[in-house]
């Protein structure tokens, strides 16, 4: 039994490695790496190094066992660390280019009436056991309310409701130098990617949002709305992002944030008190249109909080959008929470390597995001029959032509058999009645009754 289990595990590993190899070939990841400045002058190729690190969680190994002490790996740990610590490598461009190719693949499978969205959120990048990690700071975990050592991982994802693609991220430290536990350890050329990453790590969060959205839209990735939590749905942020894309976000209850409503400047709580509420246990309590200080009109939708005896408020810049659609579309924001959970628990985000170099953290986080893209791609091609290509569409057109008629014919045939069993049955009248129904339906779709004759089973 032990030999059988070992053999099955080996077969599973080979199968996964084959799928990963197909993924790298299909989307030409080696070419993407080369065009983004990630090259090697000697030794093994960048693609083989990246693919080896990429594969680790899928074969049940961590970085130490899979790369450092693994005798089967044809290169040493120094080559892997050299790849991760490169200061001129544009990992952000790698992620955007791969995301653009996957978007083109998913976009063909998405109906036009389904709203694609961008989702903005942040999560903690936990390095609680570290002391000398570059730009290390203390960040507040929103889920526990405690402070821990690490970074804030600001992420933006694309979702069509079925698949979620992480497209860009910023690893953020504290803007206050006094609050950082470890300072910058490298002297860098200000033109290189490493310097720009460190500079943005010490900037405020809201500064990055517009740049991230513009980068994503500039590579041809389209979305109808951007979804944000209450931490980001501030009037200044809304006014900035609304120049590029419509917004749906949760409103923060704060006496410091004001909207212009009914000619007066007031906070969200004051607006809610003055609105007429719907009776009973309605899910949507009220809705109204307010104005920001820059003159832009926004729609406020107040909904019942099912977990507390309280209310929540959603904001959208699309004032023509129905209240129910605002709630439905905002529900897609949950996709990024699933992504964070999956990345931390299964894809080894912030756990696989213990590098103290900031560039290595950026490179490894990018590879983790690429792993999630691979999983999303595999799930889509295995669950969505439209990935079979043109054959699917031809089969679908045939099914659309005959499925209703054939179903109606079978139902009426069963009804005739049932009437025969009752004893009171007029063959001529019933046959004429059913034939009239079938012929009328056939004329509507341009078929004949011979098309419904079932072939005998062989």
Task: Give the location of each predicted region.
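Extended, non-catalytic structural segments that build the interaction scaffolds
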Residues: 52, 311-334
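Short, positively charged, Gly/Tyr-enriched micro-motifs
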Residues: 32-104, 112-113, 160-165, 209-219, ...
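A short, flexible helix-boundary coil/loop motif
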Residues: 1-44, 56, 72, 171-189, ...
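Electropositive, glycine- and tryptophan-enriched low-complexity nucleic-acid-binding patches
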Residues: 60, 78-82, 143-222, 299-312
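Short amphipathic alpha-helical "interface-anchor" segments enriched in bulky aromatics
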Residues: 120-124, 323-354
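Active-site-proximal, Lys/Arg-enriched surface segment
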Residues: 86-176
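Acidic, His- and aromatic-enriched active-site or binding-groove loops in soluble protein domains
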Residues: 245-257
